Amino acid sequence: LVHTFHEVTMWIEINPDKKNCIFDPIFIQKAAHESTRLHPSSPVAWRKPTCPVQLPNNKEAKEGDKIIVDLYTCNRDEEMFGEDAKQFNPFRKAPSGQNTYGLSFGLGMHSCIGRNLAAGVVPKEDTNPEDHHYGTVTLILKKLFENKAMPNPDDPPKMDEKTKRPNWGYYPIVFDR
């Protein structure tokens, strides 16, 4: 939620002509998915194969080996998400067969049980905005933007210094009337 709020408000600063996008819930959901791709809640996933498997780096993992998947790096892969993969682009198109939020919610039997609750259902071209399932993150952001929330200019946000992960430790907002 905080990463998406920050990404969108910074994006609007450099794209002021797109400010009205923040009142479109489909746009907000796409922005939430893009932000989730860039800022997965867990930067890695651990898996153990149930049989020997050949990895993409041509190494073989044996049954029971611990395989660490670097989600942070995978979600920023330029071959998968384009030359600007490390940047926030709420209009990014997902590669064929891929999710707009990358691997942030996992896949298959290891997918996050709360994905649809938090992120909603990925919108399609013909999605009806009136009955679409947006997810809680989008709905909260929609209300924040409707009420003119913005970062507090007198009390700037601060990163969490207790972790190496790029997370916000403090992010005050104000409502402009």
Where are these regions (language model features)?
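A generic secondary-structure signal for well-formed alpha-helical elements
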Residues: 9-16, 39, 144-149
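C-terminal helix/juxtamembrane-tail motif
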Residues: 168-177
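Conserved cytochrome P450 K-helix/beta-meander segment immediately N-terminal to the heme-binding cysteine loop
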Residues: 70-97, 105
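Central I-helix of cytochrome P450 enzymes
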Residues: 1-21, 137
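Cytochrome P450 heme-thiolate "Cys pocket" and heme-binding signature region
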Residues: 92-169
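Flexible loop/turn segments at secondary-structure boundaries
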Residues: 53-54, 75-78, 111-113
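A translation/RNA-centric and nucleic-acid-associated enzymatic feature enriched
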Residues: 58, 63-76
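Conserved cytochrome P450 K-helix E-x-x-R motif and the immediately C-terminal K′/meander segment
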Residues: 19-59, 68
